[in-house]
Curated annotation (Swiss-Prot):
Residues 54-95 are annotated as: 5 X 8 AA tandem repeats of P-H-G-G-G-W-G-Q. Cu(2+) 4 binds at residues 88, 90-91. Glycans are attached at residues 184, 200. Cu(2+) 2 binds at residues 72-74. Monomer and homodimer. Has a tendency to aggregate into amyloid fibrils containing a cross-beta spine, formed by a steric zipper of superposed beta-strands. Soluble oligomers may represent an intermediate stage on the path to fibril formation. Copper binding may promote oligomerization. Interacts with GRB2, APP, ERI3/PRNPIP and SYN1. Mislocalized cytosolically exposed PrP interacts with MGRN1; this interaction alters MGRN1 subcellular location and causes lysosomal enlargement. Interacts with KIAA1191. Residues 28-110 are annotated as: Disordered. It comes from Budorcas taxicolor. This is Major prion protein. It is linked to Found in high quantity in the brain of humans and animals infected with degenerative neurological diseases such as kuru, Creutzfeldt-Jakob disease (CJD), Gerstmann-Straussler syndrome (GSS), scrapie, bovine spongiform encephalopathy (BSE), transmissible mink encephalopathy (TME), etc. Residues 25-233 are annotated as: Interaction with GRB2, ERI3 and SYN1. Cu(2+) 1 binds at residues 64-66.
Length: 256
């Protein structure tokens, strides 16, 4: 019984090795074309045999030893040994010789204007000595008590800033000081920057701009104050003894 099992395993091993060798022999060689080495017309058998006699060395339609339609030894439709659609060799389909790759996705282009603008904004803030630049805001709707000024603001609001410069709120004792400093530095920087571009502001522009920037600075103060108190509350919460004891107990349970 043992000998019969050993013989069966030897037979299975022999069959597996023989099958692997057979598959290796059947693998196509690189560089050959479709139906290379055959002498029949691909896909259409002729009842009377080949209609035309072979011409030296290759199969039917192989004048120089290649596959069907291989005048120089390439694959099917390969006149010079490349891939299908490669008249002069090369890579994949549509990559023949000096031709560019067909339908190749182009690389995304970097918007240099955005990069330059970001770099300039960072340089201006760095040169102001501790001032930060707030996020962009929608320009507020303000009534100035004069039809002329209201109309002037609606027609020229795009010329006024939509961001403000400010220092951290913990450096000021109250909102008025924060807003006053914020308005002065923002109007000054916007006026200087715009003047260097060849555009001047009138007295009406300055008056309207100060009102607009004041409202924006108030909004910025409210945002910064809320964020500051939330950070302070988080620090107080996690520094209290009960919370520290609870966290230590949880760490002990996890580690232990």
């Amino acid at each position: 019984m043992v000998k019969s099992h050993i013989g069966s395993w030897i037979l299975v091993l022999f069959v597996a090795m023989w099958s692997d060798v057979g598959l290796c022999k059947k693998r196509p060689k690189p560089g050959g074309g479709w139906n290379t080495g055959g002498s029949r017309y691909p896909g259409q058998g002729s009842p009377g045999g080949n209609r035309y006699p072979p011409q030296g060395g290759g199969g039917w339609g192989q004048p120089h030893g290649g596959g069907w339609g291989q005048p120089h030894g390439g694959g099917w439709g390969q006149p010079h040994g490349g891939g299908w659609g490669q008249p002069h060799g090369g890579g994949g389909w549509g990559q023949g010789g000096s031709h560019s790759q067909w339908n190749k996705p182009s690389k995304p282009k970097t918007n240099m204007k955005h990069v330059a603008g970001a770099a300039a904004a960072g340089a201006v803030v760095g040169g102001l000595g501790g001032y930060m630049l707030g996020s962009a805001m929608s320009r507020p709707l303000i009534h100035f008590g004069s039809d002329y000024e209201d109309r002037y603001y609606r027609e020229n609001m795009y010329r006024y800033p939509n961001q403000v410069y400010y220092r951290p709120v913990d450096q000021y004792s109250n909102q008025n000081n924060f807003v006053h400093d914020c308005v002065n530095i923002t109007v000054k920087q916007h006026t200087v920057t715009t003047t260097t571009k060849g555009e001047n502001f009138t007295e009406t522009d300055i008056k309207i701009m100060e009102r607009v920037v004041e409202q924006m600075c108030i909004t910025q103060y409210q945002r910064e104050s809320q964020a500051y108190y939330q950070r302070g509350a988080s620090v107080i919460l996690f520094s209290s003894p009960p919370v520290i004891l609870l966290i230590s107990f949880l760490i002990f349970l996890i580690v232990g």
